[in-house]
Amino acid sequence: MASPAVPANVPPATAAAAPAPVVTAAPASAPTPSTPAPTPAATPAASPAPVSSDPAVAAPAAPGQTPASAPAPAQTPAPSQPGPALPGPFPGGRVVRLHPVILASIVDSYERRNEGAARVIGTLLGTVDKHSVEVTNCFSVPHNESEDEVAVDMEFAKNMYELHKKVSPNELILGWYATGHDITEHSVLIHEYYSREAPNPIHLTVDTGLQHGRMSIKAYVSTLMGVPGRTMGVMFTPLTVKYAYYDTERIGVDLIMKTCFSPNRVIGLSSDLQQVGGASARIQDALSTVLQYAEDVLSGKVSADNTVGRFLMSLVNQVPKIVPDDFETMLNSNINDLLMVTYLANLTQSQIALNEKLVNL
């Protein structure tokens, strides 16, 4: 990701907000004999970025960033990272699945933004399958915006992606995110740069300002529109956004949701015994619901559902048949193993603490 940001001298024409597609005109550049016609967001590797012709607009970027008005050092951008990317335009029904860590990271980066920054942007990472795009990670990218230009630290983004690949080599660049409830002319420029890293990238918007009383989360992909041979525009088409989570993420989300009922918005971590007790209570409530449903079906109060019946039968068949005496023996053996591991862990901790005190004497 080595392409610099470019100025936006001609503001795009933006249509109505989502769920209708958002239409944005591509940025215009000074006419020169060697400048090709504007291209869609998924720019070929040989197309140079447009450059502003007004020297008064060019302003120095922050340290480590590439000024928006500077032309690319090489006319051919860096090649995309290898690996399966988004296979062309999104087919109908393509779904974007977001994990809770994405939203938490975006909100955290917005709260820690530099003074005076209107919004924050970042890179989305994840995986792709035939029916959905799963966004599992992200990181923020420093940038500066003004009315005339935008400067993005693409070198920082490249280095961060290389570090993420060492931990999660299967995660690919899927697109980028931005805080706010609308799409600006700068969004078109930034989206064009990410199209060089991933075909048909996703643009995720998170309304951290709560314009309508809630955090609106929307995802878009861009498509080219316009008359051939004329100034082309970019249309941002909304996608379906769903939320997915692993079991460990679900535990954290459930714990965070409990703070809604706390007066000071703070809740302490429960002990292992309390967690086991809470899980047992939830299982008991679920079994009570199943038994009540079965009794209502047998009594004729509720019509039978074959799908529910097959699901319950599958659950019953998965329960192993164990003799009560054998189950008690297995449980006691596991408890003894757990107590032994706990004892050894505490003994090791005490030995380490004693060793540190002896070293400091």
Curated annotation (Swiss-Prot):
UniProt catalytic activity: Thiol-dependent hydrolysis of ester, thioester, amide, peptide and isopeptide bonds formed by the C-terminal Gly of ubiquitin (a 76-residue protein attached to proteins as an intracellular targeting signal)
Residues modified as Phosphoserine: 52, 262
Residue(s) carrying N-acetylalanine: 2
Superkingdom of origin organism: Eukaryota
Region: Disordered, residue numbers: 1-91
Residue ranges constituting the MPN domain according to the UniProt record: 96-226
Residues modified to N6-acetyllysine: 242
Keywords on record: Acetylation, Cytoplasm, Hydrolase, Initiation factor, Phosphoprotein, Protease, Protein biosynthesis, Thiol protease, Ubl conjugation pathway
The enzyme's E.C. designation: 3.4.19.12
GO biological process terms, semicolon-separated: formation of cytoplasmic translation initiation complex; IRES-dependent viral translational initiation; proteolysis; translational initiation
Compositionally biased tracts (Pro residues): 74-90
Coiled coil segments of this chain: none
Localisation per UniProt entry: Cytoplasm
GO cellular component: eukaryotic 43S preinitiation complex; eukaryotic 48S preinitiation complex; eukaryotic translation initiation factor 3 complex; eukaryotic translation initiation factor 3 complex, eIF3m; synapse
Main location: cytoplasm
Biased composition (Low complexity): 1-32, 42-73
HAMAP family to which the protein is assigned, alphabetical: eIF3f
Domain notes: The MPN domain mediates deubiquitinating activity.
Record family assignment: Belongs to the eIF-3 subunit F family.
Subunit structure: Component of the eukaryotic translation initiation factor 3 (eIF-3) complex, which is composed of 13 subunits: EIF3A, EIF3B, EIF3C, EIF3D, EIF3E, EIF3F, EIF3G, EIF3H, EIF3I, EIF3J, EIF3K, EIF3L and EIF3M. The eIF-3 complex appears to include 3 stable modules: module A is composed of EIF3A, EIF3B, EIF3G and EIF3I; module B is composed of EIF3F, EIF3H, and EIF3M; and module C is composed of EIF3C, EIF3D, EIF3E, EIF3K and EIF3L. EIF3C of module C binds EIF3B of module A and EIF3H of module B, thereby linking the three modules. EIF3J is a labile subunit that binds to the eIF-3 complex via EIF3B.
Protein name, UniProt field: Eukaryotic translation initiation factor 3 subunit F
